[in-house]
Regions:
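Conserved short loop/turn motifs at secondary-structure junctions
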Residues: 1-3, 99, 103-104, 185-188, ...
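Intrinsically disordered, low-complexity regulatory segments
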Residues: 1-170, 491
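Basic, low-complexity terminal or inter-domain segments flanking catalytic cores
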Residues: 2-3, 81, 118, 173, ...
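OB-fold/S1-family RNA-binding modules
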Residues: 51, 94-99, 139, 232-251, ...
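C-terminal or mid-to-C-terminal helical accessory/interaction module adjacent to the motor/catalytic core
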Residues: 137-222
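C-terminal helical "lid" subdomain and adjoining coupling/linker elements of P-loop NTPases
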Residues: 184, 203-251, 303
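Metal- or metallocofactor-binding catalytic centers and their adjacent structured scaffolds
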Residues: 244-289
Length: 760
């Protein structure tokens, strides 16, 4: 029996449909009388241990315990997936061999492999790489099963990412949260290997905008008349001339006006202007590449305002409908063995009236081989394209329709000719000044024809460059019109979801070490195609950023956390290098263990920075009357109370009164000499549920006792002799009380008699 394990139920059902007649069972589908069985995970059904599950002492956040580095990494089954895990485990026992049908990327590889490792599987495992779920693609993939061992590097890469994220997140989040609480802040400070430098991009962009000072500068535009037509030009500055700033902008309007007067005067006196340079080059622009997930997310964000997460979710739905290929692809190229599908896909487009695809598909040439067809650029998956399954546009949602059309048109562009144009540069000399004009003449529209009916985007207006008349060097022209143009520099734009995702992908532009930037240019950025959208959504959910209209703006909390982190955390240099290392683990260049050893060394350095950071005290919090540090609101077993942030050196506490510490109650407190649990003093407290006695060490001991006539009732449990009796009201009978063991030893409850336990 072959056992297929898919990433999630919808994908499992899609695979099963292509294997034969199936019968649905609990957590699986049997095909061909049990010869094949398809089961599935629910995404990751295993999760990392929390620190407190490695060691009880880690349940408390203590700086001296850091770093926490597991000697042996452990996973546990998620509670909600326990039943499905058991089903998978039992099915593996019956299987002759297993087929890993996880998504064709490093996370999909790990997702299935970690389950097989957890159950101790010894059966042979094959790997199926499904880039699409239509019948033809599934049948082809079934005929090309690989040995799962060939993908150990891919699995280890995902495992390295997971464990590195745990080390950074668990340790640095604890360290900075402890420091922030010492300063009087109450929220958890999350630190993420990718999340934090991504947040820093937003914070730094906001700071650039706030500190931006506009600069007014001037340019001189002159239109010249040639016998064959007009030539628009811009004045070329001389590098050593007066009035230029460090970026070669002319800041003096007087100089600009003087230049214009100089040209006009020369023209009025009959001084000729002459063409001194004519450069003409025939240029070609190859077909645009099909989309990867990130390039689609950027385009859909720009054009339709869709968030990266919306794009990912929508493309996932189209994939599961078998209409488009695997969505989480970082590739923009196509394998040559899929060229045979082109005629079918183009024929299907002949039925799509939207965006004129039917019209354009009629003129497409499936014999054209664009630069996108390149096997050398293909790894586990290829660019996003339509499958051979015909689409009924009427059945698609608005978002599905928009994204399908974007993907389809980019695919269609591969079967149109190259775009050809002639670029012309003209330089005109007059009165010892030079003016340059650039023109463009379209020779063959080619693939750009299918984008012509779109509204031109302001960032893609090459075709709108002027068409210059036929000219030659030495031709004389005359001055027609001149204008001094005032220009004002503008601040950088705030990020949108789409442009932030693009920045994550092009992270080499944002590293601090500019020498490193060049080497990272080929790096795939920080995060992955599958995770970037979730990281941006995570920043919103953590309230580190908010959205104003479509733009991302950092919150006060977002600014604060970036301000306290060292550059090693907030700049993407280190994270980008880690991503490059993960790629090297995937291709077998470096082993997992050496990567993790390196991460621990980096972590120790980052923890040293965290321990030495000086955070500004939260001035909004009350001050401890005994040591001068801030008081923090805490949750105790009997309700909220205020404790000194200097604990354990200072053990000052106070009850909460309408959100503030009530220090006046101390004058009314009654004390006894000794807490029977720890030996410290007991004090009487009047809480909202009545009067009781509590150990003064509310964080360390927190023993409590009932009050009877202004004295604590200290009675050992007669059942175990260890715990102490506590008083509680019966849930079944209002006004009736009973006593139970504080250690919950299981002894029968004792009924209350006049405020005391009714003991024999």
């Amino acid at each position: 029996m072959r056992l297929f394990i898919a990433e999630k139920p919808s994908l499992g059902r899609a695979i099963a449909e292509n294997l034969g007649k199936g019968v649905s069972k609990d957590g699986c589908i049997e095909i061909n009388n049990g010869q094949d069985i398809v089961t599935w995970c629910f995404g990751h059904i295993l999760e990392q241990y929390d620190p407190g599950e490695y060691d009880e002492r880690y349940k408390k956040w203590v700086m001296d315990d850091l770093p926490i580095v597991p000697e042996k990494w452990k996973l546990k089954v998620k509670k909600e997936a326990a039943k499905q895990f058991k089903i998978i485990k039992e099915l593996t026992k019956k299987a002759d061999y297993i087929i890993n049908a996880g998504d064709p990327d490093r996370e999909g590889q790990l997702l299935i492999d970690e389950v097989l490792l957890h159950i101790g599987n010894k059966k042979p495992v094959k790997r199926i790489l499904l880039n699409a779920l239509d019948q033809k693609s599934v049948v082809q993939a079934l005929g090309d099963l690989r040995d799962n061992k060939d993908y150990i590097g891919l699995r280890d890469s995902a495992l390295a990412r997971s464990q590195a994220d745990w080390l950074v997140g668990m340790n640095l989040s604890r360290a900075y949260t402890i420091k922030s609480r010492d300063a009087g802040y109450d929220s958890v400070v999350h630190v993420g290997r990718v999340q934090t430098p991504t947040l820093a991009l937003v914070v730094r962009r906001e700071e650039e905008i706030q500190h931006f000072k506009p600069t007014t500068h001037y340019a001189l535009q002159v239109i010249w008349q040639h016998e064959n037509g007009q030539i628009p030009t811009m004045w070329k500055f001389k590098p050593d001339m007066e009035g230029l700033d460090s970026e070669n902008r002319l800041l003096s309007k007087d100089i600009a006006d003087g230049l214009l007067s100089k040209i006009q005067s020369a023209a009025n006196h009959g001084d000729g202007a002459q063409i001194v340079v004519v450069e003409q080059k025939k240029k070609q622009e190859g077909q645009r590449l099909p989309y990867s997930l990130s390039t689609l997310q950027v385009e859909a964000g720009r054009k339709y305002g869709l968030t990266p997460q919306q794009v990912l979710d929508t493309m996932q739905s189209l994939y599961e409908m078998k209409l488009t290929t695997y969505p989480r692809s970082d590739c923009e190229y196509l394998p040559t063995n899929q060229m045979g599908d082109a005629s079918v896909i183009l024929k299907n487009m002949g039925n799509i009236e939207e965006d004129h695809l039917a019209e354009f598909s009629q003129r497409a040439d499936p014999q054209i081989v664009s630069r996108a067809w390149n096997d050398a650029k293909i790894s586990a998956h290829h660019a996003l394209i339509p499958t051979t399954v015909p689409v009924d546009m009427a059945k698609l949602s608005d978002e599905q329709k928009k994204l399908y059309l974007l993907v389809a048109r980019a695919y269609l562009a591969q079967f149109y000719p190259i775009h050809v144009y002639q670029a012309t540069k003209v330089v005109i000399s007059c009165a010892d000044e030079e003016f340059a004009g650039n023109g463009k003449t379209i020779l063959a529209m080619g693939w750009k024809e299918i984008y012509q009916k779109e509204k031109k985007d302001s960032d893609d207006n090459d075709e709108e460059a002027p068409v210059l008349p036929a000219v030659a060097e030495g031709d004389v022209v005359r001055y027609e019109q001149g204008t001094v143009k005032e220009k004002i520099t503008t601040p950088p734009k705030r990020f949108t979801d789409a442009t932030l995702l693009q920045a994550m992908k092009e992270i080499h532009k944002y590293v601090k070490d500019k020498e490193l930037a060049a080497s990272l240019k080929e790096c795939k950025g920080i995060g992955t195609e599958a995770t970037r959208a979730g990281i941006i959504e995570g920043l919103k959910k953590a309230r580190f950023v908010t959205t104003e209209k479509k733009f991302l703006v950092p919150t006060d909390m977002g600014r604060m956390v970036i301000s306290i982190f060292p550059d090693k955390i907030t700049y993407p240099d280190t994270t980008a290098l880690w991503e490059a290392d993960l790629d090297r683990i995937a291709d077998g260049s470096i082993p997992l263990n050496s990567f993790l050893t390196k991460q621990v060394d980096i972590l120790n350095s980052l923890l040293t920075d965290a321990k030495n950071v000086q955070m500004q005290t939260n001035k909004d919090l009350p001050i401890c009357p005994n040591c001068g540090k801030t008081m923090r609101l805490r949750k105790g077993k009997l309700g909220n109370f205020w404790g000194c942030s200097g604990y354990p050196d200072c053990k000052t506490t106070a009850p909460d009164k309408k959100g503030k510490p009530d220090f006046t109650v101390k004058k009314e407190e009654r004390h006894t000499d000794k807490c029977p649990s720890c030996g410290k003093k007991l004090r009487q407290i009047k809480g909202k549920f009545g009067t009781f006695w509590s150990c003064e060490d509310r964080e360390g001991c927190n023993a409590t006792f009932a009050d009877h006539k202004d004295k604590p009732v200290i009675v050992k449990c007669p059942g175990c002799g260890k715990g102490y009796l506590r008083r509680a009201e019966s849930k079944k009978k209002k006004g009736a009380y009973f006593w139970y063991c504080s250690d919950r030893c299981g002894a029968a409850p004792i009924w209350d008699k006049s405020g005391l336990p009714d003991l024999p």
